[in-house]
Each structure stands twice: as structure tokens, then as C-alpha cells.
A protein has these predicted regions:
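Core transmembrane alpha-helical segments of multi-pass membrane transporters/permeases
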Residues: 1-13, 185-249
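Short helix-coil transition sites and intra-membrane helix breaks within transmembrane domains
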Residues: 3-12, 43-55, 84-90, 226-227, ...
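Juxtamembrane helix-boundary/capping and inter-helix hinge elements in multi-pass membrane proteins
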Residues: 7-10, 20-25, 64-72, 97-106, ...
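Re-entrant/interfacial helical elements at transmembrane boundaries that shape
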Residues: 13-16, 50-63, 90-101, 251, ...
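Alpha-helical transmembrane segments of multi-pass membrane proteins
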Residues: 28-42, 67-87, 107, 111, ...
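Long, contiguous bundles of hydrophobic transmembrane helices that form the permeation core
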Residues: 109-216, 335, 342-345, 366
Length: 366
């Protein structure tokens, strides 16, 4: 669905509409912090970190450069815009909700959302201070490269609503809206896709052209399915291997020896996921491997599985922005014509602040 939104220019239209009020501000680093918050909001509707980052590179990046922010500072804010993998359409959210056997809207609204707002605000302040400090410290960089960034297609003004439709459907037809109607993520995506398809037909008045454009949707679906199936099979085989070797029993015994409480276990598991995500360059692969094992581990310890998995999910998400090999870091660095290592220097402090805030937030809120 995100790929189709990109194809018809709906995501670009939404970004342009939300960015427009910020043009009037002439305070570069205040705009930078606000752009980060905007990016965080859009990440709920665009569940792929790289897709969102590339969209922001053609919309937000030139604006920040013209205001006087350095290329590496602007790129750091854009790369970390998908800071935490949350929302009803996020793969990790669907995995954890299924493992816990709770509805996706309940997990999203009841656990993710409050923590998401807290981390977003604190990290925006960290970006404001860190990027301003580094820009003053570092030598000025050439900003002419923004001219080489190709423009993304932009749809009509009404198209800005389409990226929001799945989220509206999922939350609207739940206990937070109309509880009498049940709607899962798949149905919400397909219904929103049908509405967007009808709008495209009205816009172009050419059935063949519109139907041909649907290949973008199904190609994106196929790519995601192949990726997910590979992760599921690989994760289950790996997890079963750990159980067969007795490593899970050894881990439970070690954790019992440490006498960890819920906060301690959340920190340990979240830190472990952060490290795995940094090494692999993926936040989803480690989760598919270890999340199915968590209920057994926490049940033996008598602790809450939800907060543990929430900490693991956030740790895995944040690890992406501390890894120079993650697709989003490589992609943004390539478009901005900077080194991944230089980008990593700019993302590290805000991401570590986000990690600490996430841990403290879980302890305080749950």
C-alpha cells in the first residue's frame, strides 16, 4: 500500500501539505526539530523506514538545506524519522500482537502510542541541540547537491487523505470507535486501496492505465510476502534449534539467578535487540527469531510479557540508526552524498537519548 501511495503521489502530497506552514519560520533548528516530529507522525502511516526516508529526502531535505542546516544534519533528522516501528501496519507490531494474542489496535493505542509521543518530543529536543552543536563545530559543507535530487510525483490535494485511511479504518472500527464492526489490518489496507483506485479512475478516466498501475501494489505485496515468509521460516528454525540445544532453559536459569524484575528484563532484552539490529542492519529479523520465545521465558520468571516485548521492539528499531549497514542509513547517505559513518555520528546521540527515554518511559508508564 505504501508503494502505491508513493506511485500516485499521495505520500508526497501529504508531506508537502504538512510542511507548508513551516516555510514561514526562519529558525533553522526549530524547523529541523518540527520536521523530525512531522516525520515521526508520518511514520505511523508509512511503515517502511527506507520508503519514508526517501520521500522526505525529496520534500524536507532541500528545505532544511536552504534554511542553513548542513547536509549531514538534515540527513540525520530524516534518517531517524522512522525512529520506532509502531502503528497498526508495522510488521513488528503485527508479530507482537499475534504472539500476545491481543488485538492490534489495543497494543498500538494502549502501549505504543503514549511512549511514542514521549520519545518523539525528547528526541526532537536532542536533535535540535546536537545538530546545532555539530553544525557550529564542523566545517561548512557544500549544499549544491540538493539540486541533483529528483522530484517525487505529487498527487491532487485530496490525495493527502489516502495514506491516513488504513489507520482511520483500523482505529475507527475498534473499541476506540465503532466496536460493533470488526476490521483487521488486511481488510483496512484493501479497502483503502480500493478507494484510492477509484479516485485514480476518476482522475485519469482511463481504465487500462489505472489497472496497469495496480502492478505497483501487487509487486510491493509480493516483495513483502517473500521477505516475511523467509523471516518466519528462518526464525522458527533458529528458535527450535535453540530450544533443542537447551539454550532457552539455560537463559531462563541465568535470568532467574540474576533475579531481574520486569524493568531489568526489559532493559536486558531491549539492549540485546539493539545490538542484534546494529549487527544485522535489520530490526525485523531479530524480532521474528526471538519474540516467539519470550512468552516461555517471562512465564518462568513470572513477569509481564507485554512490556518486555515493547522494550525489545523499540531496541530493535533504534538499532537501525546505529548501524552503518542498515538500508535506511545507506540509502539516505547515498542520496545526500555523504558517508554512512558521518551520518552515524549525527544519529548516535539522539538515538541513545531515545533509547534511555524509551526504557524510562516503559518503567514509568507501565
Amino acid at each position: 500500500y505504501a508503494k502505491y501511495m508513493e506511485h500516485i503521489g499521495a505520500g508526497t502530497r501529504l508531506a508537502h501539505t504538512l510542511i507548508k506552514p513551516l516555510y514561514r519560520l526562519n529558525r533553522p533548528y526549530i524547523v529541523l526539530a518540527l520536521m523530525f516530529l512531522l516525520n515521526m507522525g508520518l511514520s505511523i502511516c508509512v511503515p517502511n523506514p527506507l520508503s519514508l526516508a526517501l520521500l522526505m529526502m525529496v520534500t524536507i531535505y532541500p528545505v532544511l538545506l536552504r534554511l542553513g542546516v548542513s547536509p549531514v544534519g538534515a540527513a540525520a533528522v530524516i534518517a531517524t524519522g522512522h525512529l520506532m516501528d509502531v502503528g497498526p501496519g508495522a510488521v513488528s507490531t503485527l508479530l507482537i500482537a499475534k504472539t500476545l494474542n491481543i488485538p492490534v489496535p489495543n497494543y498500538f493505542v494502549g502501549y505504543q502510542l503514549r511512549l511514542y509521543f514521549l520519545v518523539a518530543v525528547v528526541t526532537a529536543v536532542a536533535h535540535f541541540l546536537w545538530q546545532r552543536y555539530r553544525d557550529r563545530l564542523d566545517a561548512p559543507m557544500d549544499v549544491g547537491d540538493c539540486e541533483s535530487i529528483s522530484e517525487a510525483p505529487i498527487g491532487p490535494k485530496s490525495y493527502m487523505l489516502f495514506p491516513l485511511l488504513p489507520l482511520c479504518f483500523i482505529l475507527g472500527f475498534s473499541q476506540y470507535g465503532l466496536p460493533g464492526v470488526k476490521m483487521n489490518v488486511t481488510l483496512a489496507m484493501m479497502l483503502a486501496f480500493g478507494i484510492a483506485l477509484l479516485a485514480e479512475l476518476i482522475r485519469h478516466r482511463n481504465l487500462r492505465t489505472v489497472l496497469k498501475s495496480t502492478t505497483v501494489f501487487f509487486e510491493g505485496m509480493g516483495n513483502q510476502f517473500s521477505y516475511a515468509v523467509t523471516l518466519i521460516i528462518g526464525g522458527q528454525v533458529f528458535a527450535q534449534g535453540l530450544v533443542s540445544l537447551g539454550l532457552i532453559d539455560s537463559l531462563v536459569s541465568a535470568l532467574q539467578t540474576l533475579s531481574l524484575n520486569s524493568e531489568g528484563l526489559t532493559s536486558v532484552m531491549g539492549g540485546g535487540m539493539l545490538g542484534l539490529s546494529m549487527v544485522t542492519g535489520s530490526n525485523v529479523a531479530p524480532l521474528f527469531t526471538l519474540v516467539p520465545l519470550v512468552p516461555n521465558i517471562v512465564s518462568n520468571l513470572g513477569l509481564d510479557p507485554i512490556t518486555t516485548m515493547l522494550g525489545m521492539q523499540n531496541g530493535a528499531s533504534l538499532g537501525l540508526f546505529l548501524s552503518p549497514i542498515s538500508p535506511v542509513m545507506v540509502g539516505v547517505a547515498g542520496v545526500a552524498h555523504i558517508k554512512s559513518v558521518d551520518l552515524l555520528k549525527r544519529t548516535s546521540i539522539p538515538v541513545l537519548v531515545a533509547l534511555i527515554t524509551s526504557c524510562l518511559g516503559i518503567w514509568m508508564l507501565y
